[in-house]
A protein has these predicted regions:
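Residues that flank catalytic or metal-binding motifs in active/ligand-binding sites
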Residues: 1, 94, 115
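P-loop/Walker A phosphate-binding loop and immediately adjacent motor/lid segment at beta-alpha junctions
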Residues: 58-65, 69, 108-143
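Short, acidic Gly/Pro/Ser/Thr-rich loop/turn segments
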Residues: 12-15, 105, 127-128
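Hydrophobic, Leu/Ile/Phe/Ala-enriched alpha-helical segments that form helix-helix packing faces
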Residues: 42, 68-72
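Core AdoMet radical
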Residues: 19-31, 44-59, 74-87, 97-122
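Canonical Radical SAM [4Fe-4S] cluster-binding loop centered on the CxxxCxxC motif
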Residues: 1-30
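A short, N-terminal amphipathic alpha-helix
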Residues: 35-42
Length: 143
């Protein structure tokens, strides 16, 4: 089970975004203390902590990922970004999963075989493999 943490102030403003309320700077600051509180509340029910957004401050998202791996190593860490690529200031090795790509309505979401979005999983050797196809229904995949 994944705990998805929405991060507001999204600069991407993708047309058709299902979370357009996150375009504004709303909510509470996401701190290491807040992460600890989430872990205390949901820790036995989750296996992954996912940051949904954070494109306006990728350095902080990276720092929070490092914190989780150091202080809560039992959890995987994921980041869903609307950017085309991971910013150079982010160390991809601090994440177990990374989704990149803006939402483009006519291409569809991650579950569509025509999507531009990609989900990557870090392998044991540190390389990342594209696992997007796992979200597609078999009948949607061209053979």
């Amino acid at each position: 089970m994944t705990l998805a943490i929405n991060i507001s102030n999204c600069p991407c403003h993708c047309p058709g975004c299902h979370s357009h309320y996150l375009w504004e700077d709303i909510g509470m600051p996401l701190t290491t203390g807040a992460i600890d509180d989430f872990v205390s509340q949901y820790g036995t029910d989750i296996t992954c902590i996912a940051f949904m957004g954070g494109d306006s401050d990728p350095k902080t998202v990276n720092q929070l990922a490092q914190y989780i791996h150091e202080y809560h190593p039992q959890f995987h860490v994921a980041w869903y970004s609307g950017r085309l690529r991971v910013p150079h200031i982010v160390n991809k090795q601090d994440f177990d999963y990374i989704k990149i790509g803006p939402y483009i309505r006519h291409l569809g979401p991650l579950k569509s075989s025509t999507t531009n979005q990609r989900l990557y999983r870090r392998k044991m050797d540190g390389d990342f493999e594209d696992i997007t196809y796992r979200f597609w229904r078999q009948r949607d995949v061209a053979v």
